[in-house]
């Protein structure tokens, strides 16, 4: 996605150069942690979780929590429930036996994230229509959950301890609407050095 900037008269007679590309390969390994918050049990008919590389599943084999469908703060997101449990969806003449895929998006479903890679773009609508899901395994089997606000915040480039205001939905909207802080920092540093 291109970014456009207008610098008014600050750059008259000067040439702005964007920072050099960073060559490190970002991934989600140090960001996404085990948590059963909002997790839903995934059965083999929902998705064959054994097809996901073992290193991509966040595990705590001592944990014996199960999904909590009664506590509104711990219930799986309704969009996750639909994408994980509804079968045989037809879209533009193509039948999808399930609506989940690992490491890539399908037009009608959600993506089980590959923590070895960077995240797809986080947008403000993730609060009401999440499409990126974390694969989990504990004593009771396999689960999926949405990315949590603290994880989304770090994916977007905010420090782990950065404070947001409002409830969980407002946090996600703020994160999704934000320009990544590392990008702004590099641009400002280049502006200052002009």
What are these regions (language model features)?
Residues 1-13:
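Rossmann-like dinucleotide-binding core of oxidoreductases
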């Amino acid at each position: 996605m291109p970014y456009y900037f207008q610098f008014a008269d600050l750059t008259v007679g000067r040439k702005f150069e964007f920072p050099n590309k960073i060559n490190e390969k970002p991934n989600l390994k140090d960001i996404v942690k085990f948590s059963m918050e909002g997790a839903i049990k995934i059965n083999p008919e929902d998705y064959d979780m054994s097809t996901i590389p073992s290193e991509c599943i966040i595990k705590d084999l001592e944990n014996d929590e199960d999904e909590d469908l009664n506590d509104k703060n711990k219930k799986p997101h309704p969009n996750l429930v639909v994408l994980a449990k509804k079968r045989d969806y037809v879209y533009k003449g193509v039948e999808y036996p399930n609506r989940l895929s690992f490491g890539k998006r399908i037009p009608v479903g959600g993506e089980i994230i590959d923590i070895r890679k960077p995240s797809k773009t986080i947008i403000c609508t993730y609060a009401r229509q999440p499409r990126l899901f974390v694969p989990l395994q504990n004593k009771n089997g396999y689960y999926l959950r949405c990315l949590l606000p603290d994880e989304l915040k770090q994916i977007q480039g905010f420090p782990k301890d950065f404070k947001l205001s409002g409830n969980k939905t407002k946090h996600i909207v703020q994160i999704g609407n934000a320009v990544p802080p590392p990008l702004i920092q590099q641009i400002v540093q280049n502006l200052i050095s002009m």
